[in-house]
């Protein structure tokens, strides 16, 4: 969960998000080293009077500044491709949930059950209870089992939306006429908040997402009551 004045990313709750955090730190360190080198060279150019106006050819320097950026790009691309492959891989999901974006709410359907579906609307500010979060609470939470692979099928009934939950490393476009899929696995129980991340109209800011991750026994009890 995010907190006021937070500068970093949210705490990782899924293996994918942990990998994304490691990749973020890896890339940030490379950017920091490059920036430091560039600033050092600029400071030398501004403070020294030594110049080489007669230099017409520098094969060694040209070779270095051609090969070095290529190596840096490879060091960034390899872990990135690995994470992209992990995010795209879906093996034997334990549960499938179909979510549809609407202007301006989400609807969910548990496809493994015969009649388990509902709409999820934001709770208006004037109806919030003490301790609830403004613009993030919904009337129907998406209850899912923790430590199990869940496949999310994402689409839209009208315009472009985007189903995103930052702490799980999820962001999938909801496109009319197209069915996108992603997987999630939460390692800890709790409430995880997200929002529509694609500008979809006047009430775009009022399409929150709330996932309630619970142990399998609680999920089975909840699903039995809902059906």
From Swiss-Prot:
Cu cation A2 binds at residues 196, 198, 200, 204. Residues 1-14, 88-227 are mitochondrial intermembrane. The modification Phosphotyrosine is found at residue 218. InterPro entries: CcO_II, CcO_II-like_C, CcO_II_C, Copper_CuA, Cupredoxin, Cyt_c_oxidase_su2, Cyt_c_oxidase_su2_TM_dom, Cyt_c_oxidase_su2_TM_sf. Keywords: Copper, Electron transport, Magnesium, Membrane, Metal-binding, Mitochondrion, Mitochondrion inner membrane, Phosphoprotein, Respiratory chain, Translocase, Transmembrane, Transmembrane helix, Transport. It comes from the Eukaryota. Its cofactor is Cu cation. The keyword Transmembrane helix applies. Its main location: mitochondrion. Its EC number is 7.1.1.9. It holds the Pfam family COX2_TM. The chain crosses the membrane at residues 15-45, 60-87. Binds a dinuclear copper A center per subunit. It is found in: Mitochondrion inner membrane. Mg(2+) binds at residue 198. GO terms for molecular function: copper ion binding; cytochrome-c oxidase activity. SUPFAM superfamilies: Cupredoxins, Cytochrome c oxidase subunit II-like, transmembrane region. GO terms for biological process: ATP synthesis coupled electron transport. PANTHER family: CYTOCHROME C OXIDASE SUBUNIT 2, CYTOCHROME C OXIDASE, SUBUNIT II. Component of the cytochrome c oxidase (complex IV, CIV), a multisubunit enzyme composed of 14 subunits. The complex is composed of a catalytic core of 3 subunits MT-CO1, MT-CO2 and MT-CO3, encoded in the mitochondrial DNA, and 11 supernumerary subunits COX4I, COX5A, COX5B, COX6A, COX6B, COX6C, COX7A, COX7B, COX7C, COX8 and NDUFA4, which are encoded in the nuclear genome. Component of the cytochrome c oxidase, the last enzyme in the mitochondrial electron transport chain which drives oxidative phosphorylation. The respiratory chain contains 3 multisubunit complexes succinate dehydrogenase (complex II, CII), ubiquinol-cytochrome c oxidoreductase (cytochrome b-c1 complex, complex III, CIII) and cytochrome c oxidase (complex IV, CIV), that cooperate to transfer electrons derived from NADH and succinate to molecular oxygen, creating an electrochemical gradient over the inner membrane that drives transmembrane transport and the ATP synthase. This is Cytochrome c oxidase subunit 2. It comes from Canis mesomelas elongae (Eastern African black-backed jackal).
């Amino acid at each position: 969960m995010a907190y006021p004045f937070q500068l970093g990313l949210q705490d990782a709750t899924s293996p994918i998000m942990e990998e994304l955090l490691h990749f973020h730190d890896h890339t940030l360190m490379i950017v920091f080293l490059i920036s430091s080198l560039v600033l050092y060279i600029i400071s030398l150019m501004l403070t020294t009077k030594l110049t080489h106006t007669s230099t017409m050819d520098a094969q060694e320097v040209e070779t270095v500044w051609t090969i070095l950026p290529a190596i840096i790009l490879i060091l960034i691309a390899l872990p990135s491709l690995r994470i992209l492959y992990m995010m795209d891989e879906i093996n034997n999901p334990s549960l499938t949930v179909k979510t549809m974006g609407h202007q301006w709410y989400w609807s969910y359907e548990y496809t493994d059950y015969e009649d388990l579906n509902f709409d999820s609307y934001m709770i208006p500010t004037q109806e919030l209870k003490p301790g609830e979060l403004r613009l993030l609470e919904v009337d129907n939470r998406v209850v899912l089992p923790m430590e199990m692979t869940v496949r999310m099928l994402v689409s839209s009934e009208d315009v472009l939306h985007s189903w995103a939950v930052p702490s799980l490393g999820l962001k999938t476009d909801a496109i009319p006429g197209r069915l996108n899929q992603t997987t999630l696995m939460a390692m800890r129980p709790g409430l995880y908040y997200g929002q529509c991340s694609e500008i979809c109209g006047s009430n775009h800011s009022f399409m929150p997402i709330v996932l309630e991750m619970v142990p399998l026994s609680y999920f089975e009890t909840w699903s039995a009551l809902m059906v």
